């Protein structure tokens, strides 16, 4: 069965207020961007790209749709090579961002550091060189740092920054001594990204139910010495965006590590 974008249950509208307030020409474009944004949160990047592409057909000057395409082809926590180069898309975003808000322009400018013409031209999918690189991921994380500070309290910006930090060592945030069993942070970056999320949860009640932050927190702590700290975030994801399978499945990453095996199976069953 092939699902249409509108077949997914994204939960209550306030979850994606960032997406529903982007600069664009009409409501149809806005609604399509919301769909793309939801799939982006769900790590369904191919479907997100299709939605963002539809946005650009409806409104070629929707800079954030071009940003979304570039973001979704970039390296991500589950697939470091990414899906391709976002250079052309982000250049288009830069070209049409004149009417955008300051926040949108800042996000577009930051993402432009992640994609270069040289990386695009040297891409070779046969060796999983898709036009992304660790060096470009570092550049993007560094570009997002001042934006995070400028818009502190904006939970979507916080999530984008945290994800940029996590992508610097995807699935390698923690080191385990196989002789002693001791688990320690891989580097200062791990401590930083965990602190950012935990401080945000403490300062903003809405952060505790923010799907992107809850998702990233589960990934950040699942291999840590204290996965149980992510149980509240996991509980949020069980029902927060019920049509998005990856987010509904995410609690099982924590459940398994804290030996809630029955709950883990239930989370996986709900996501299918």
Describe the role of every protein-language-model region:
Residues 32, 66, 73, 106, ...:
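TPR repeat positional signature
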Residues 262-269:
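Conserved small/polar residues in nucleotide/adenosyl-binding loops
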Residues 28-44:
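Alpha-helical segment of the N-proximal tetratricopeptide repeat
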Residues 42-47, 69-101, 109-126, 130-133, ...:
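Inter-helical turn/loop elements of alpha-helical hairpins
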